[in-house]
């Protein structure tokens, strides 16, 4: 069932999203060689609580961390450990803020620099995903369909990358994961995919591999 939010609920989610955006920006800018995944997790939790939110992922039964962290060949949903990140690592952080009964969900990925060297293949990989993601987000509007979003993300396949089809974006609100599912590939004809309506709230996620 797809939940349509009220204007007040939208304002609450917007505030939670602003907190999450600020937290994730600080976290990603703070990641450096030698930090452990658990230290990154602790930083995210501290910042969320300082801003008046709660770690949304900790409300998932059985999950005890603020973030999921995915390094290099981990796709998504990696659990923070004592592993230290190093130069050249691709580090993805997925995080959620819970505020006044509503969830938000956001992820960001960075490439830890190799000093004076560059890694053009990884930089190209990350740019392709970010460009496709923003093109997809621009399609989230009343009257469009989920397929309009999915096909934009699937465009990374034209660059030789592959979409992970077992993991998808989703609605978000009172629950962290709500309908509709938003795959990064065209799972059905666009006209048969769910219709976006005003005051729907979704998490658009591009999940893809280099190979």
Range-by-range predicted roles:
Residues 1-211:
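Active-site neighborhoods and metal-handling regions in enzymes and metal-associated proteins
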């Amino acid at each position: 069932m797809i939940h349509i939010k009220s204007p007040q609920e939208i304002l609450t989610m917007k505030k939670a999203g602003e907190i999450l955006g600020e937290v994730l920006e600080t976290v990603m800018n703070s990641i450096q060689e030698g930090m452990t995944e658990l230290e990154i997790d602790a930083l995210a939790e501290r910042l969320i609580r300082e801003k008046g939110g709660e770690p949304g992922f900790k409300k998932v039964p059985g999950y005890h961390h603020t973030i999921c962290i995915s390094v290099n060949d981990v796709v998504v949903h990696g659990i923070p450990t004592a592993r230290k990140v190093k130069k050249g690592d691709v580090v993805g952080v997925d995080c959620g803020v819970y505020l006044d009964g509503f969830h938000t969900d956001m992820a960001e990925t960075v490439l830890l620099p190799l000093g004076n060297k560059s890694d053009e293949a990884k930089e190209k990989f990350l740019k392709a995903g970010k460009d496709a993601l923003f093109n997809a987000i621009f399609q989230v509007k009343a009257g469009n369909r989920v397929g309009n979003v999915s096909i934009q993300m699937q465009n990374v396949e034209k660059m030789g990358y592959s979409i992970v089809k077992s993991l998808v974006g989703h609605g978000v609100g009172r629950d962290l994961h709500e309908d509709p599912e938003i795959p990064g590939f065209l799972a059905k004809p666009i006209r048969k995919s769910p219709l976006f309506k005003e005051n729907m709230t979704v998490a658009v996620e591009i999940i893809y591999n280099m190979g």
